Amino acid sequence: DKQWIKKNSLGENVLYNLESLCEIMEFKEGMRVLDLGCGKVASAIFLAKEFGVEVWAIDQYITPSENYQRIKEMNCEHSVYPLKLNAKELPFPAHFFDAIVSVDSYMYFGTDEKFTPYISQFLKPGGTIGIVDICFSKEINYLMEVPEFMREHYQDKWYFVHSLDWWNKLWIKTGHLKILNAEIIPQNEFIKKEYVEDFKFSKKSDAIADALAQDKDGLINIFRMTAQRSEKPIDLGNYCMEV
């Protein structure tokens, strides 16, 4: 249901990006999946219905009761479990999940260097993590490098956005993850265009849509990245998270 998806997406159509991730990740019936920053659970519901997996859907801002209503509407109450949690304060045991996904939200909590080993602890060795998010075509290191069209909202919308190369280096730094795939998604131009058109049609203001409309040099893009959990042990005493 296209209208249901739009209604339950925070920003662009979340399933466009999730489907791109599913092209390069393997999900099997009965797997335990963690959906980080699930928003209004559209992604978690899709995974449960499409692949028969169990999904722990966490978000810091959307209430579990609100998400549970959506889950019941789609008859997924026995396979999608909504929780209100900070991504840096998770209660799960080590090696609990077969896969971790994050669609359009990882950059809000995953740029901390300590977060990579922290989140990796919840994956079984050999398990996979996959994200889809916004990136820059080149790294912006100084405020003077920020394009004019982006400067008004840079400090609240863009300063934590990085290049694909930056993300690649972050994930391999501690040896707990082995990169399987890191690239701009094939649907990049289509999804960006749809995002701009959706907000133009709705006549709502959105800083990201406004920036995309003015980005003539292709600075802003959407990437997908997957990695496999290595066998390397994780000593969490070295990776205490600050929340």
Regions found by a protein language model. Name each.
Residues Y159-G175:
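Short alpha-helix
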Residues I134-K157:
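Short, glycine-/aromatic-enriched active-site segment of Class I SAM-dependent methyltransferases
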Residues N181-V243:
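Conserved Class I S-adenosyl-L-methionine
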Residues A99-T111:
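A short SAM/SAH-binding and catalytic strip from SAM-dependent methyltransferases
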Residues D1-M25, S43:
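Conserved class I S-adenosyl-L-methionine
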Residues L34-L36, K40-E89:
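Class I SAM-dependent methyltransferase SAM/SAH-binding core
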Residues K88-I100:
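A short acidic, Gly/Pro-enriched loop at the edge of an enzyme's catalytic core
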Residues E113-T128:
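A short glycine-rich, Lys/Arg-flanked "PGG" loop and its adjoining helix->strand segment in the class I
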